[in-house]
Amino acid sequence: MRRPTSLFLSKSQFTRGLQCHKSLWLLKNRPELRAEPDAGLQARFDAGTEVGILAQQLFPAGVALEYSSGISKNISTTQELIASGAQTICEATFRHDNVLAMVDILHKGPDGWELYEVKSSTETKDIFINDTAIQYYVVAGAGISVSRVFLVHLNNQYIRMGELDLKALFTIDDVTALTLSRQVDITQQLAEMRQALAGSEPSIDIGTYCNDPYECDFKPYCWQHIPECSIFDIANLRSNRKFSLYYGGVLQLEDIPSDFSLSDNMKIQVEAELTGREVFNTQNIRAFLAAITEPVGFLDFETFMEPVPSFDRQRPYQQVPFQYSLHIYEKGKLRHHEFLGETGRDPRQDFLEKLLEDSQPCRTILVYNQPFEIARLQEMARDFPGFAEGIDSIIARIVDLMEPFRNRDYYVKTMCGSYSIKYVLPALVPDLSYDNLAIADGEMAMLAYARLAKLQEDEEKKKIKTALLEYCRMDTLGMVKIWQKLISMTQPKGQLSLF
């Protein structure tokens, strides 16, 4: 017999229940089915904690409660602090109607207590009002007179110069009216959640709510019946249209009705999946290749971003380049240049100095996903205007190697709807693989670079640096091989030998 489910709810459980009752039920009854957060998601959680702690400094006289003290202890301590005249309490803890709320910052204002909810986002989003609404419900229900509710978030226009300016780093939005407008629904919402929790696993099919507003960590369980390369893998097809097919009984690509509207690129993908035929537009690819002139550079950046800027001329969540790989092909020979910034200092100026020198011989510079590299270059030109002329010269020579694949001038079913280099490379050059690399994608590279700054052991630092260089080098070597393969496929056999 299944043991009774606890009907006690935390703020995060309440907002989970708003997204999906089944997700809440699984959390309470089958937590072992929950996907563990990957390193990237955990890093974002940690960043949110960092921002929350930093925001407490907006109220320097505040008293902060420790989560490790336990919920019951913190509830009683909160009441004691209020009774003793405390003006600011961080992580103030309340319980009402069997719901727990821990307020990031509770401050005594001129007209009563003020709630401050801190987010590591750079804007106030509608979904955040669900957080403030349930907090207000609990705190007011616990007998506290709440006069105003605020949402504290990062200001993405803040540019660090010298010491952090916390008042400029954070933006404080008054969300009192929005918070109050949702109070009328909370009692009913809680009743519906508790009714769902009291029964067996809710019979709720997958839907857009599996990814909106957040990707659910029970998705691997609920989506286990979805095969590889299903209708959900059709690139650029809107989510609601995918689910209209799914709810109509269509899951496999071959079952898509003939009158269902698809773009030309979507049709190419579906046809390739069904027939196994390779799509190769020789004319378009030849025209693309004709615009590439030797010496040819193959360039890739790695970047990091952080909510709280560490360096001058840096903004919250700005993508900061810390590494590049540049292969140069000229007259049948290939040479390689690379850069990896030293941790603990702003890498951008050193990055630019070496890149401008290394890329000087290139007449064409191939990148994969041109908007990303160009945006980073333009940002560095803005932040370091002394390099602007050289940066403009690089931008003028950039050609996007992604173009033939994004346009579906080349497509095979193993690409599964994607034109990411991680799918294109194995399709064209199956013997070149990231599988044996310690670092296999950009997010891993960013996390490794962040870890590098915290390490003391030289041997471990050396291993990570080597792994970073190997990964970035593989990206640009892969670009070389893709370019080579496209050339060889557009010319008669035996006519061309690049390497």
Stretches with model-predicted labels:
Residues 108-112, 225, 247, 329-332:
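Short acidic-glycine loop/turn motifs at beta-strand connectors
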Residues 94, 283-361, 382:
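Conserved RNase H-like, two-metal-ion catalytic cores of nucleic-acid enzymes
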Residues 250-308:
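Long, highly charged low-complexity segments
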Residues 1-111, 239-275:
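Metal-dependent nuclease catalytic cores that hydrolyze phosphodiester bonds in DNA/RNA
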Residues 157-228, 248, 416, 424-499:
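Acidic, Mg2+-coordinating catalytic module of metal-dependent nucleases/exonucleases
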Residues 204-213, 217-255, 287, 296, ...:
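Helix-loop elements that line ligand-binding/catalytic pockets
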Residues 216, 299-301, 367-370:
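Short His-Asn-centered micro-motif
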